[in-house]
């Protein structure tokens, strides 16, 4: 990204971390000192998880670089303040916060452009990944919260996977998968065959079983 933006004479004016997982809070020193925002809840989770997140950076992260977890600021409202986004004065960039994948996770909705940046939600290469072990209800609530902006979006960009101009298909696929798992049915979802998703599916089935058992007791 550094080389790509430099070749096009683009300047980083701000950043938004959708949630407190290490791969979504990365930062390159050459991006400069642009403001970096996240939700207050995500910042709280960063404080609680920091040791683990630092370990997850691994040996590939240059030791001489500043920690990417330093310098993040909590949003004071459900919108990104200027100077984030130089596309035009007053362009609204609204956050849609939920706890579906991680506490304080937020999508970023650029309504004037019809673009939804979904973070670790609504992927075509990952199953729904609720916060293990007991936040499946929060994930269902997250899909409900996202539904309105997904319906308006022309383009959806997930944190992992491919952008799509058919956002509702992603939402429908996740709901259909979770409906099957919650009902105890075999979920016919091709994403189960992808790397790491077999284990993820087993965990989701475990969560759904615990939820059903709790509701019936």
What does each model-identified segment do?
Residues 148-155, 162-217:
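Accessory terminal helices/loops
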Residues 10, 34, 91, 153-154:
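A structural micro-motif
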Residues 40-44, 122, 183:
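Short, acidic/turn-prone active-site loops that include or flank metal/cofactor-
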Residues 7, 43-99, 103-174:
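Metallo-beta-lactamase
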Residues 5, 27-32, 89, 110, ...:
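Alpha-helix C-terminal capping segments
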């Amino acid at each position: 990204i550094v080389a790509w933006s430099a070749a096009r004479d683009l300047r980083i004016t701000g950043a938004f971390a959708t949630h407190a997982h290490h791969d979504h809070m990365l930062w390159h020193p050459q991006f400069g000192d642009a403001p970096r925002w996240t939700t207050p809840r995500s910042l709280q989770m960063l404080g609680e998880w920091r040791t683990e997140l630092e370990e997850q950076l691994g040996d590939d992260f240059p030791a001489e670089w500043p920690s990417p977890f330093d310098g993040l600021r909590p949003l004071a409202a459900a919108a990104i303040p200027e100077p984030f986004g130089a596309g035009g004065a007053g362009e609204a960039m609204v956050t849609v916060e939920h706890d579906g994948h991680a506490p304080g996770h937020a999508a970023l909705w650029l309504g004037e452009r019809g673009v939804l940046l979904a973070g670790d939600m609504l992927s075509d290469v990952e199953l729904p990944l609720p916060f293990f072990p007991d936040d499946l209800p929060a994930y269902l609530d997250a899909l409900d919260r996202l539904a309105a902006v997904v319906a308006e979006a022309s383009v959806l960009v997930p944190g992992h996977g491919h952008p799509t101009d058919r956002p509702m298909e992603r939402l429908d696929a996740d709901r259909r998968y979770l409906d099957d798992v919650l009902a105890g049915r075999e979920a016919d979802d091709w994403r189960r065959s992808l790397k790491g998703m077999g284990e993820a599916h087993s965990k989701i089935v475990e969560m759904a079983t615990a939820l059903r058992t709790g509701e019936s007791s």
